Amino acid sequence: MGERKVPHVRKIDLEDPLDGTLRGHVRAMGYTDFDMARPIIGVCNPWSELNPGHWHFRALGDAVKRGIWAAGGFPLEFPTISMCEVFHDISTLIYRNLMAMSTEEMIASMPIEGVVLLSTCDKDVPAQAMALATVNKPAIIVTGGTRLAGYYQGETVACSTDTQRFTWEYKAGTIGECEMREVEMNGFYNTCGACGVMGTANSVQSMAEALGLTLPGCASIPAVYAQRIHMAEATGRQIMRLVQQDVRPSDILTRAAFENAIRVQMATGASTNLVIHLIAIARRAGVDLTLADFQRISEATPFIADVKPCGSVTVEELYHAGGIRAVMKTLAPLLDMSVMTASGQTLAENLEGVEVRDPRIIHPLSDPIQSSGGLRIVRGTLAPDGAVVKTAAASPHLLRHTGPAAIIRDARTADGRAGSVSQEEIDQDFREITADHVIVSRYLGPIGAPGMPERGPMGLPTHLLRQGVRDMVRVVDCRMSGTSYGTVVLHVAPEAAVGGPLAVVQDGDMISLDAQAGKLDLLVDEREIQRRLAAWTPPLPAYRVGYRSLWLDQVTQAPEGCDFHFNVDPEWREKQARRA
């Protein structure tokens, strides 16, 4: 896509008598000419009391600014939206693109020479990475870290992986309300920070470090540790070096860096959401990343970090074993060690002297937990453009399975978006299904829901839970929380709402999954599939005005990263004009 542009930076002129308006506005906030003589550094801080992952960002932001002042800069802090999936009434993937656009416009248009970005959660880290890749001013991320583990009856527990497990046991009748209340109050939610497993939030923080966008060791430090404050202050100092040395995101976000990040994803059993996010970031950086890259790298990368949900320990325990740095040190023979990072050094230099402190948690390459990365891309008549299976979180006996389809009802709210399906409705609809059925959930994709909510591991019927069934094959066009587990075929593309074959599956149709062979097929004659598709009509759009309408008009499909067409396709307007 050619060389990345170097953006113009407007600076405060202390001598020009006609530039007094800008100087005056800065003085109005209490700053002086002495301050304005320094390089202005933006501090992007999405602090919010509607996001426990960002609740501690006032302290982290102050630490970043201390570092900038100490290194000779002039920090000016600005906010953006802040997203926690639990608080929103709609999938926060919709707002990833909004946060990316607002962040990139602030960075691009303000008189700042570099920027430090604070983020913790599922969509915030990718949004900021998309923004800094687009603007290409010197930038560095400091992540918020993981919350501490909880304890319940002598067991280490963490949300939301263990939340899912306890919820199913409650529905099966093996534990009662008192136990559910106790583990909620005393086990899952002890501190601020990301959910304490390798869910999407900790996965994207690890992704940022693996890409080289943070200082070494940043990803795994728990949110409430003093070392997290120290890291924030060091990041403030480091942005000044990046500005002075003119190190830009385009120097860091190379194809090799993205392949390194995918390897770390596979080695840690990280969230499948990284497939969407890494593709989106890569395309902003001019790197053509595809599902085939994930398949190729997964096959050649062992799963070595025994961290939940695919393993047995929390991210706090992973930190004490050496963290993501130690994972990358172990993976060194498989990584491109020459890549530049935000430390101003190569990855090889960053990892000098790093050791694994607990090989029971971070396994050596000679003794992996699994020989491959635990993610498969499947294609076939049900997913012509591909789908994703997290085999590391699946039941091995279900990864090759053929069974009849059982279609879950398409619940909608009054305004037309996807609603939740209650356990009672699941029990009513599925009262006669067996564990051999394949549960199908559709119209939950980027456009259909809209926003691809994390509904992949939808609930199982109570009669099967009471029989001891805890997993079934599920096929969906939505996403799955990185904290979840189960045999779920995700991100089916094209999605049902745009006329993918998933839209015309009928109850009782046989569906065949062979994850190892990379196949997902609807065992219906091709002529019958085409007949059904010809008779199919698309659903009406849920929104006709506002930002959500823009999302519906512009979002790409999952294999393209769910970014907006106009952000990644320079010829989009011409293509639209030709169609008209």
Locate the predicted segments by residue.
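Catalytic or ion-coupling anion/metal-binding cores of large enzyme and transporter domains
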Residues: 2-55, 60-81, 86, 92-95, ...
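A short, small-residue-rich loop immediately preceding and capping a beta-strand
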Residues: 108-128, 139-143
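Short, well-structured alpha-helical segments in soluble
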Residues: 98-110
